[in-house]
Each structure stands twice: as C-alpha cells, then as structure tokens.
Amino acid sequence: MALKITQHKGLVGANPKQRKNMAALGLKHINHSVVHQDTPVVRGMVNVVRHMVSVEEVAGE
C-alpha cells in the first residue's frame, strides 16, 4: 500500500518543524503530490503537517 500526499497550504507562517517535515516528504509547493510507502515514519511526518496536506491511499509500491 502507498500514500499519495498532496500539499494544499503554503509554508508561510509554518514553524521550522513543519517546514522540515514538508521538505522530508518532498513537497515543495501548493498542489504538489508525492507517493510514499505507508510506513509509521511517513504517517508520523504527515501527522505533523496534517492541516496542510491531504492523504489518499493508492495501490502499488
């Protein structure tokens, strides 16, 4: 199972922890999407920025 993560809000006003998590996820700008494996590490990073992103489960690796 994989997760499609899409950034919906910008980083203006975000704290440094949120900025680092967005960079670690590979998200650079609004409406940018990335696909990551569904792991506890990725889920934790998404949880930190949950108000800035949307998450969908997609099939595949």
Swiss-Prot record:
Similarity remark: Belongs to the universal ribosomal protein uL30 family.
Alphabetically ordered keywords of this record: Ribonucleoprotein, Ribosomal protein
Subunit text: Part of the 50S ribosomal subunit.
InterPro entries, per database record: Ribo_uL30_ferredoxin-like_sf, Ribosomal_uL30_bac-type, Ribosomal_uL30_ferredoxin-like
Annotated protein name in UniProt: Large ribosomal subunit protein uL30
Pfam families: Ribosomal_L30
Ribonucleoprotein found in the keyword field: yes
Gene Ontology BP annotations: translation
